[in-house]
Amino acid sequence: MDLVRLTSLLPPSVMGGPTSPRPLWSNQGLPFRFQSKNRFSPVAAARASHAASPAELYWKIALPTSPMPGAIRDLINPARSASQEDTDMDEVSTDAVFFLEKDLFPGSKITLHFTRGGACAMVLLRGRADAIPFASEKLPEILTQLSVPAGSRAAEDMRTTLAECEAALLGARDQAKHCVTSLESMVEFAAASLGTRDIRAVSTEVIGTGAAETPRQEYTVEAVKPVVSVSGGNMVTCHGMPYAYAVFGCHTTTATAYAVTLAGADGTRAEALATCHGDAFPGVAEAYERVGVAAGSVPVCHIMPLGDMLWVRN
């Protein structure tokens, strides 16, 4: 359901204002400041309010039985996004740690550096996102509209993301792939791919800290349980991509997913998602080289970074 139609049915008091609902962004453009990690972050936090945001209202109505994962909560909380520490993107390493599925058990050790994925800027709703072009040929217009300096590293990241999203349309035939630019389009892609609207999203979450990352350290695996009970069932993964607002590259997968409880040496605790691939999935030959096995011979796993999401049937 489109948020414009959805919110038109709600009284003004529910929307936190006396008249029409406040958009996530002003119609006068989107101000951003450069950050070395993802290069995009809102400059100013939204006015504090106890009223639910439009994004939260949409979620509650579209997915009433599904808790909102931390990855989404962070993207509708501009105060948290704006406070994230600068980190060189070359240091992002959570999803570069690979291990064998047989080594994922209570008591095993994994050295990790939790960092956020590509999406750090605020998630938009469809009405705002659809008003902004999303095509390589429109990049100059996009940069002007979003106040991103042409020739900047941020602009180059946006160019790369647009090119990758356009290439995804010509991708592998055995996977549904799509770049989503709004919360509604993500929910609808996941629902269409899984064949039901009775779905939920899960994400890696570090417990009890608002930091954008954690130090690299050894974690002890305390518990492991499958995310879905039926092995081999389709899931949808959404990976954050660097852009001036939240953009995710989503695709179907038949990987096996586990919810993993981790305890860090410094007391940090995390509920992480591990995905294990039993075939030679594209682009990760390096993963098999690192664990010292032939590609596709045994399942190889990785921890999903903060900010990425996994969608499954309830």
Curated annotation (Swiss-Prot):
The keyword Signal applies. PANTHER family: BURP DOMAIN PROTEIN USPL1-LIKE, BURP DOMAIN-CONTAINING PROTEIN 7. This is BURP domain-containing protein 8. Residues 98-314 form the BURP domain. It comes from the Eukaryota. The keyword Signal applies. Pfam families: BURP. Keywords: Signal. Expressed in shoot and panicles. The lineage of its organism: Eukaryota, Viridiplantae, Streptophyta, Embryophyta, Tracheophyta. Residues 1-16 form the signal peptide.
